[in-house]
Amino acid sequence: MQYFIDTANLESIKKISDIFPIAGVTTNPTIIAKEKRDFKDIINDIFDIIGRDKIVHAQAVGSTAEIMIKEVKLLHDTFGENFYTKIPVTPEGIKAIKNLAKDGYKITATGILSPQQIIMAAEAGAEYMAPYINRSDNIGENGIEIVKDAYKILEMAKKTDEEKLARYKRIFEPKILGASFKNVRQVHEAILA
């Protein structure tokens, strides 16, 4: 299990990372915009606080696969091996994930609202899957059940590793990164899933 801080506020990151054993930081365009600073400066400052051995997730903002691919390559060249780009599980996002994963780029599939999206993102080669728990609940789905289904799906996918190892330049070990929590109960239930 890994714990991530979901913020770009440097003071909060300093305080929390000083106390808790975190794996890294997650952000999104809205969180970054609240800081009213340059994106690259924020990400570099986050790495300076938590260390380059920790993980930072930040989202691509392109609307087409081609733009996302260019963006991901630039971001990974800028921030290094522990930088993961969050790509939404839209058709264009899946296309970008598929193309980037085969070249070894580290991708987090985000905006997941169904088990089918987890299957597509995992098959495309995303390493982290970020199902939106509360947002799923708000549209009549059960966010925790999606996490439970995700674990089952990913365990089945791991059994077909040989084909995936040939397809991708890294070990296929997808992970669940729960997102869009609104209360502690949701976090607790996701951990138990």
What are these regions (language model features)?
Residues 19-24, 79-81, 99-108, 123-130, ...:
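Glycine-enriched alpha-helix->loop->beta-strand junction motifs that scaffold or abut catalytic
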Residues 4-6, 34, 57-64, 81-90, ...:
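Catalytic beta/alpha-barrel core
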Residues 11-19, 67-71, 96, 114-124, ...:
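Catalytic cores of alpha/beta
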Residues 40, 44-55, 94-105, 143-176:
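Alpha-helix-loop-beta-strand connector modules within alpha/beta enzyme cores
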Residues 2-14, 19-22, 27-99:
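Active-site beta->alpha loop and helix N-cap motifs at the rims of alpha/beta catalytic domains
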Residues 119-127, 141-152:
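Active-site-proximal loop->helix
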